[in-house]
A protein has these predicted regions:
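Extracytoplasmic gate region of multi-pass secondary transporters
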Residues: 25-26, 203-251
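Conserved MFS/SLC helix-loop-helix module at the cytosolic interface between two early adjacent transmembrane helices
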Residues: 56-92
Length: 387
């Protein structure tokens, strides 16, 4: 069995490559609108097509990992993801671009599932949220790199070049991750009524509600930060700087919140999840006000907003995995991630419509309310010590 450090590094690198497109495409949102003639709502659909594909396939990816083994499932998923991105790069309409990104998302679904299962097996409870935090840090890391790289690539070779580079990264890192996983043994047999037992686990449904509320806030910030900053009269460079700031905040916060949640042998998970929502709610209100001030205020409040709005998911995922028997941890993660991914994809077009019809002030107030509601729901989660 490969060492925990090697697997964590490989899982994180593969996840960063996936996020280069799935979370970084917003960095060239204005260019996509111009090239494909998209409305704000249509742009939202394009930006989350990859996430939607992954969300629809996560549970199936869990079954594939159990049935085929982590290595074979990861190689197959990587091949499909690469093909989808190449098809998207060659598309000439918004609908074909959406389809290619959707197919790619289906393929990439195996990366987070295989990674989470491997980390649950290799890390004890007192280090597990930290390890998931490192892996989840790779999501905004990919977005941070793409915030710089995608606009530069688009300027040189258009959207086509940006997507082809993304395809190459997904292919190379996916293969490397599969090799790092090694020949892990497959489960002896299927767990009977696995998904029913996961959904009936103590506090699982409430945890999923928290995830639904929090991910709407996350998508609001990631997908519409750049258009909001531009609409407030700031330059494209300021908007890019704000997007980069949010991604840096996400990278730091996921490790910090994960470390905090590991305290008391993992007994601080619920309190940490509540605190992320409270910080996000306050950050949303501060950011809304800062858009009427100067550059420094926008960047500072974007940092605070991102620290809460993008820092919760590693804690939520590890809590989901710990509410099921250890042999079902990967599938339990997949269930939680499915809900989060699908809601993130479905909510983004309506969020764009909200901004277009109600304005950005109302938009950010709504996100603050949703973050606060998530924190209130999280308060009543069962406080259990993970095994």
């Amino acid at each position: 069995m490969r060492s925990a450090t090697v697997v964590l590094a490989a899982a994180s690198t593969a996840q960063a490559a996936v996020s280069f497109i799935s979370f970084g495409l917003a960095a060239i949102g204005p260019q996509l609108r111009h090239e494909y003639g998209l409305s704000l709502a249509e742009l939202g659909a394009i930006l989350t097509a990859n996430l939607l594909g992954a969300g629809l396939a996560l549970v199936g990816a869990g079954v594939a990992v159990d049935g085929l083994g982590s290595r074979a499932a990861t190689l197959a998923g990587t091949a499909l993801a690469t093909a989808g991105l190449v098809a998207a790069a060659e598309s000439h309409s918004g609908s074909l671009l959406f389809a290619g990104l959707l197919v790619s998302g289906v393929g990439t679904a195996v990366v987070p599932v295989a990674g989470a299962g491997a980390l649950f097996r290799r890390y004890p409870a007192e280090r597990r949220a930290w390890a998931l935090g490192i892996r989840q840090m790779a999501v905004p890391l990919g977005g941070t790199v793409s915030a710089v790289a995608l606009p530069a690539l688009e300027a040189v070779g258009g959207v086509r070049l940006a997507l082809l580079v993304g395809a190459a990264l997904v292919c190379a890192t996916g293969v490397a991750f599969a090799l790092a996983l090694g020949g892990e043994a497959r489960p002896a047999g299927r767990a009977p009524r696995a998904f029913r037992s996961i959904l009936r686990a103590d506090g699982m449904r409430r945890l999923l509600v928290v995830g639904c509320l929090y991910v709407v806030v996350l998508q609001a910030l990631i997908s519409y930060l750049v258009p909001a900053v531009r609409a407030a009269g700031f330059s494209s460079s300021v908007a890019s700087a704000a997007f980069l700031t949010v991604n840096v905040a996400a990278m730091v916060s996921r490790v910090v919140w994960g470390h905090v949640a590991d305290r008391a042998s993992g007994g601080r998970r619920v309190r940490t999840l509540v605190e992320t929502g409270a910080v996000a709610a306050a950050g949303a209100l501060l950011f809304a006000g800062a858009l009427h001030l100067g550059v420094a205020a926008v960047l500072a409040t974007a940092l605070a907003f991102g620290f809460g709005a993008l820092g919760w998911n590693a804690v939520l995922y590890v809590m989901a995995g710990e509410r099921a028997p250890v042999e079902l941890a990967g599938r339990s993660f997949a269930v939680a991630a499915t809900v989060v991914f699908v809601v993130s994809a479905l909510c983004t077009p309506p969020l764009g419509a909200l901004a277009a019809h109600a304005g950005w002030n109302v938009f950010w107030v709504v996100t603050a309310v949703l973050a606060g509601a998530g924190a209130i729901v999280a308060v009543r989660l069962p406080r259990t010590i993970p095994g």
